[in-house]
Amino acid sequence: MRCKKKLKIVWVDAEHLEPESERANPAAYHKAWHDVCTASGILVPGGFGQRGTEGMMKAAKWARENGTPYLGICLGMQIAVIEFARNVCNIPVPVSTSQEFDARDEDRIIISMPEHHPGQLGGTMRLGLRPTLWQPDSEWSRLRALYASTTSADGQSQILERHRHRYEVNPNYVSTLESKGLNFIGKDETGVRQEIIELKDHPWFVGVQYHPEYLSRVLHPSKPYLGFIAASAGMLDTITAEIVKEKTANTSF
C-alpha cells in the first residue's frame, strides 16, 4: 500500500534451483531459474532444516552478483552469510555452513546460541522483543534511513524488533566477512550477536536475524519489507525521502 503497487508473489521451490533438480526434473529446474532471473526482488524467509538451503544460497548469490534486491529473514540472513563466506571469502565447506545442517563440529559460520542446547529443541529459542543497536559508521545504510530509531541508555541509536531463532552468526568470522564487504550494521547490546547485514554498493541487499513481520501493520509497514518492495519497484529513494520528511515533521517544535 505504501508503495502503491500491486504485489505479485512467485513462489520458488529452492530445491528446484539445485543441480540435482536439473537431472531429475529439468522442466522444474529451468522454470525455477527463470522465475529467479526475472524477479524484481528475491526474498528468502525464515525456516528450519537443511532442505533446499543450497538452492537458497544460489538465489542469494544471483541477487548479490546481479544487483537484484534481496531480503533475508532469520534463516534467509544466515543463508546470505554462508553464501558470502563461500563465494567471496573462499571459506571452505564444511566450515562455511550452519551447525543446524552439520553439527559434527563447532567451527561453523552459523552456530547454535548459548541459549540453545543441541538435541533439546523444546523451549530453547531466543524469543521476544529485543533491542538492536546501529553500529558506528552505518549512517549510509538504506535500511537504517527507513527506521525511526530510539536512543539506548548509553546514547547509541537502536530499534526494537521481535525474534524467534536458535542459531546465529559465529562472531569469530565477522571480521573476515566484513573485510570483504559484508557489513554487520546492527548488533545486540553485547556487540557479539549479529542482527543486521547489508551490502553498501548494492541497490538493496539486506538480511535481518529478527522477524520484522511480527510488528508490521497496514498503515505502518515493516521497514525491511517496505525497503525491499520499494527497491524492487525502483522507488526506494522516493520512499526514503518521504520517510525522512515524516520523521523530521514529527520531531519539529
Regions found by a protein language model. Give the residues of each.
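N-terminal beta1-alpha1 cap of cysteine-dependent amidohydrolase-like domains
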Residues: 1-203, 209-253
